[in-house]
Amino acid sequence: METSRSRGGGGAVSERGGAGASVGVCRRKAEAGAGTGTLAADMDLHCDCAAETPAAEPPSGKINKAAFKLFKKRKSGGTMPSIFGVKNKGDGKSSGPTGLVRSRTHDGLAEVLVLESGRKEEPRGGGDSGGGGGGRPNPGPPRAAGPGGGSLASSSVAKSHSFFSLLKKNGRSENGKGEPVDASKAGGKQKRGLRGLFSGMRWHRKDKRAKAEAAEGRAPGGGLILPGSLTASLECVKEETPRAAREPEEPSQDAPRDPAGEPAGGEEVPAPADRAPARSCREAEGLAHPGDTGARGEDAAGHRRAEPGPGEVRTAEDASRTGAVPVKTVPLVDSEGGSGRAPAAPDPASVDPPSDPSADRICLMFSDVTSLKSFDSLTGCGDIIADQEEEAGPSCDKHVPGPGKPALSKKNPGVVAYQGGGEEMASPDEVDDTYLQEFWDMLSQTEEQGPEPQEGAAKVAAALETKVVPETPKDTRCVEAAKDASSVKRRRLNRIPIEPHPKEEPKHPEKEQQEGVPNSDEGYWDSTTPGPEEDSSSSGKKAGIPRDSYSGDALYDLYADPDGSPATLPGGKDNEETSSLSRLKPVSPGTITCPLRTPGSLLKDSKIPISIKHLTNLPSSHPVVHQQPSRSEMPRTKIPVSKVLVRRVSNRGLAGTTIRATACHDSAKKL
C-alpha cells in the first residue's frame, strides 16, 4: 500500500515532498526517508508512515526515482526549473552520498533532495506553526509525543503548508489529482518553490530569528525562536520540556537517523545528526556555529547537548547580533531548566538589552544635543536665553532681563535685546560696565532722592552681587537673577517714561531739555555728549550719570529736573513697577498707555506707542509743546517722560532741533 501510494503519489511525494517535508516533523523524527512518500501521501497516515518508514524505504527509492526522472525533465525543461534543479542537484550531490547511502540508488539523490527540501521546509513549517503562536503549542506536543504525536504534527504541518499555500497550492492541487506526471511537474514546481522558498526562507528565517528576539520580548509565547528553526526548537522543546523523557527519545530519534544513514555509509550519521541538530543550529544559529552544532549533534548526551546547543547557539547568535551573549545565555539556561517556551521568554529579557544599547545610543545622542543646547544657552545664544530664563527660575521669569541675568554676563545683552527692542544692542558688551556704573549712580541718586533709599540700597547690593558674581552657580544665579530683575526693573523704570514725573511741571521743562539733548545725541543712547542746555541746566544730577547707556538717559529723565526730582522718585517708584512691567513688553511699547502730548493737543491720553515714530513729530513742534506748558503747566504733568525715545527720534535734526529745544527750554524755564 505504501509502495503503491508512494509510486502512485510518487510525484505527489516529490512535489508534495514540501508537504511531506513540512510534515517531516514526524518523518524527520523517523528520518528513515522511506516515510517521505507515505507522509506526503497522507497526513493522517503520516504517523503510520513514520512507523512504517523501514518498509517504505525501498518504495521511497522508487518514488524518488520517478520523481527524480520527472524532476530531471523539469530541470532541463525550464530556465528557472533548471536553476532550481541545479541547486537541488548540487545539494543532492552534496548530500548525494547520503542519498545514495539511503536509497542505494542514484535516484535516491532525488529523494535526498526532496528530503532536504522537506527538512529545510520543516524548519519553516515549524516556524510557521510556531510563528502562528497557536501552532507553536502544536509543534511542541507532537515533538513531545514523538512519532505517536503524528496527528498533532500533521495539524502543525498542515498549518505550515497552508502558510506556504501560495507556493504549494499548485503542486498540492496537482498532487491531489494524483497524476504522477502532473504530480511530478507539481513536484518540480514545488521543489523549485521549496528550494527557492528554502533559500529565501532560510534568510528570512534568520531575519525571523533576529525579529524573533524582539518578538520574543514582545510575545514570549510567540516562540519565534522555534520558528527560527523547527529542528532547533524541536530539540529545545523536547529536551527542555520533559528533558528526562525527551533525551531518551532524541537519542532514539538519532538512532533511527544513524541507522537510516549508516546502513550504506557512516556519512549519513553526520548528515542526519548534523542535519537535524546542525541544521537547527545553523538555522537557529544563523550560521553562528554550524560545525559546533554538528559536534553537539554528535555528542553522546548529544541531543541534549544539541538541544541546548541550538538554543544556546541561537542565543549566542542572537547575542552576537545584539552583543548581549552572556545575558541571553543565562536566560536560555534557565529556560532550558524550565521549558522549551521558556527560552523565548528569557530571550525577551535578553533581547531587551540589545534594544537597550540602541536606546542608550539615542539617549546619548539626546544628551549630547541637550548638552549642546545647554552650552548654547550658556553662551547666551538668542532664544536659548529665554530657556535660561526658565532655568533661572520664577524670579527671573517675570522679567525678561531676568533670563538675561541668569545668562551671566549675557544678562545685560539680554536685557538690552529685550528692553531696548534691539535699540540698546548697539553696544551690548559695553553696556555691562556702563550699566554697573549707571546702576550705582542711579541707585545712589535714588537713595539720595529718599523715596526708596532702602530699596535703592538693596537694589544696589543686588546689582553689585549680580555683577560681582555673574559666574556663580545657577542657583545663585537665579537668586541674583531675581535681584537683577529688580535692578533691571529699576533700569527700565529709569528708562521708561514715568507718568508721575510728567505730572510735575518741572519735569516738562526737563523734557524739553531732554528733547534738546536728544538732538545732541547722535547715537541711540550712546551719545555721551550732553546737549548744550543739558550741561548747563540740569548738569547737577545729569553729570553724575554717564550718558552712554539708556539707563543714564533714564536717569536724566528721572532726575534731570532738580525741581521734579524729589517728587519724581515717589512717582518713580510707583511707576517703576508699572513702567518696568511695561518695559517687560518691549515688543509692544505702544501698549503702554501714556498721556501723550502731541503738538495739536495739550493733554491727550493716548495708547499710541510712545515711540520715536510718534515723537518724531515732536522735535519739529517742540516749540509748540513747550509753549503749551507755558499756557498751562498742569497739562504738562501728563506729558510722558519718554524723552529718551524722543531723543532718539530727534537725532535726525540734531543741530536745528537742539537749538529749538534750547530755546524752548529757556522759554519753558522762564515760564
UniProtKB/Swiss-Prot annotation:
Pfam families: AMER (PF09422). The modification Phosphoserine is found at residues 162, 229, 233, 355, 358. Residues 342-353, 447-458 have a biased composition (Low complexity). One of its GO terms (molecular function) is phosphatidylinositol-4,5-bisphosphate binding. Residues 1-24, 76-358, 391-414, 444-598 are annotated as: Disordered. InterPro entries: AMER (IPR019003). Residues 7-21, 126-137 have a biased composition (Gly residues). Its main location: membrane. Transmembrane segments: none annotated. GO terms for cellular component: plasma membrane. Residues 171-182, 236-260, 276-286, 295-307, 472-487, 498-514 have a biased composition (Basic and acidic residues). Coiled coil: none annotated. Negative regulator of the canonical Wnt signaling pathway involved in neuroectodermal patterning. Acts by specifically binding phosphatidylinositol 4,5-bisphosphate (PtdIns(4,5)P2), translocating to the cell membrane and interacting with key regulators of the canonical Wnt signaling pathway, such as components of the beta-catenin destruction complex. It comes from the Eukaryota. This is APC membrane recruitment protein 2. The gene is AMER2.
